[in-house]
Amino acid sequence: MRESNTLSGGIFALLNRAIGSVLLALIGFYRTWLSPLLGPHCRFIPSCSAYGLEAIQRHGPWRGGWLTLRRLSRCHPFTPCGCDPVPD
């Protein structure tokens, strides 16, 4: 029974790494190709893409992705700007 738990844990860890890599690649694509075309318009420090990179690297793809989505939902003209670091 223990071998199956180890195997499922290994698969889950591999899946987490794969999803994290895809999310980081998407942010990298945005920063390299789309952001120069759109210009800087983020209301926060750090920028939303830098926030996303740090959140995913620090908290993993699930919580980091959720934090990034919440941050993106707050980045609009009706929200006050300012410093919004990734939480611990």
From Swiss-Prot:
Topology within the bilayer: Peripheral membrane protein
List where this protein forms a coiled coil. Answer: none
Chief localisation class: membrane
Which keywords does UniProt give here? Cell inner membrane, Cell membrane, Membrane
Q: Say yes or no: keyword Cell inner membrane present.
A: yes
Give the superkingdom in one word. Answer: Bacteria
Q: Name one Pfam family in it.
A: YidD
Provide one Gene Ontology cellular component.
Answer: plasma membrane
Instruction: Establish whether keyword Transcription is in the entry.
Output: no
Functional summary from the UniProt entry: Could be involved in insertion of integral membrane proteins into the membrane.
Task: Tell me the protein's name.
Answer: Putative membrane protein insertion efficiency factor
